[in-house]
Amino acid sequence: ILLTCDKERLLPETDPYGRQILIGCGAFIELAVIAGAELGYRVEVQPFPNGAPDLKQLPGGSAVARLVLTKDGATKTDPLFSQIRRRHTNKNVYDSSKVISSSQWSSLTAPARAFGLTGGAVNQREAIEQVRNITRSSFEVEMLTARTYLESAHLMRIGPSEITQYRDGISLPSPMVNALSTFGLFDRFEIPKTGSSNFTR
């Protein structure tokens, strides 16, 4: 299996270095490894068989990986397989007053450490507020800049029917937004302005 990066799914305005698209490709690869094991196949992953793309260019059309499947009865299955269809993005409000303990954080980062990656936790209230401020500022820039907002608007999925039909994109499950859209009171392509109802929503 040769996995290539779909040029039609690139986001040059909001993902200019292809970080998100490559994360998505990586997720597919890992799912393929897990599913292959479930079916009794060992999946060998050969990353970037034609060479890694230029870091300053979007990876459209690039071969991201070659997957070689070999029947292997000794391949161990992964308990995560049964959870794949249950995965979803948690968009609930998080309680930032709760602090993750050192032992909890250690167990969360253990898989990353196995691959030589490092991670850290932001638990101090002052540091949390700094991260929030950066996030708010970044969000405002993306929402109030026409070229970045409109790129995202084309990927908005409003209400249950759109979210079910299109399994990609930016889902907006809010009942209020769905109702306003149904009655023609919410235009996803209207560029928000600071203080406007669209920006507030």
Model-found features: residue ranges?
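Acidic, surface-exposed loops and disordered segments
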Residues: I1-R201
